Swiss-Prot record:
Name under which the protein is recorded: Ribosome maturation factor RimM
An individual GO BP term: rRNA processing
InterPro entries, A to Z: PRC_barrel-like_sf, PRC_RimM, RimM, RimM_N, RimM_N_sf, Transl_B-barrel_sf
Described purpose of this protein according to its UniProt entry: An accessory protein needed during the final step in the assembly of 30S ribosomal subunit, possibly for assembly of the head region. Essential for efficient processing of 16S rRNA. May be needed both before and after RbfA during the maturation of 16S rRNA. It has affinity for free ribosomal 30S subunits but not for 70S ribosomes.
Locations listed in the record: Cytoplasm
NCBIfam families, per the entry: 16S_RimM
Source organism of this protein record: Yersinia pestis bv. Antiqua (strain Angola)
Length: 182
């Protein structure tokens, strides 16, 4: 693992995955990827982690698929004990590396914190998380404190055209055709 801050720390950091448990005795680690295709996480370099509030560059020596898992070998990490120190570290890259999206496609990171409002003007709350369900993505919306329907959280499908009527990332606003009581 490189102790240098070279390459530069990401200006626009985004978490693409997480280092999991150790694998074997030679310093390998499992990796949990948040990219659509799990192996795509290796297309984005350099990797960084934060430990005790400090950025560290992580240089990969090797990676491979093992059964259903992805495992990595980090340069300079040669035993289980050293690898154990990296367990649960988030894998961070600069978001400027992500490809441009087509119209009506959004990165989840860009939707976080957006206010969700119905077509009738009712404020449902803010997006705090996104979930993948297989058939479609779902917004997890934290309701406003004084929600008229007593809701704390809502799950709203991210179906463009059907439910999602307008997304304005500049205004941090998503307009939906959704019953606030549901």
């Amino acid at each position: 693992m490189s102790k240098q801050l070279n390459p530069a720390v990401p200006d626009q950091p985004i978490v693409l995955g997480k280092m999991g448990s150790t694998y074997g005795i030679r310093g390998w680690l499992r990796v949990f990827s948040s990219t659509e295709n799990a192996e795509s996480i290796f297309d984005y370099q350099p990797w960084f982690i934060q430990q005790a509030g400090k950025w560290q560059h992580v240089e990969l020596e090797d990676w491979k698929r093992h059964s259903q898992d992805l495992i990595i070998k980090v340069k300079g990490v040669d035993d289980r004990e050293a690898a154990n120190l990296l367990t649960n570290c988030e894998i961070i890259v600069d978001s400027t590396q992500l490809p441009a999206l087509e119209e009506d496609d959004y990165y989840w990171k860009d939707l976080m914190g957006c206010q969700v409002v119905t077509t009738t003007g009712y404020e449902l709350g803010k997006i705090i998380d996104m979930m993948e369900t297989g058939s479609n993505d779902v917004m997890v919306v934290k309701a406003n404190l004084k929600d008229a329907f007593g809701m704390k959280e809502r799950l709203v499908p991210f179906l463009h055209g059907q439910v999602i009527k307008k997304v304005d990332l500049t205004a941090q606003r998503v307009e939906v055709d959704w019953d606030p009581g549901f």
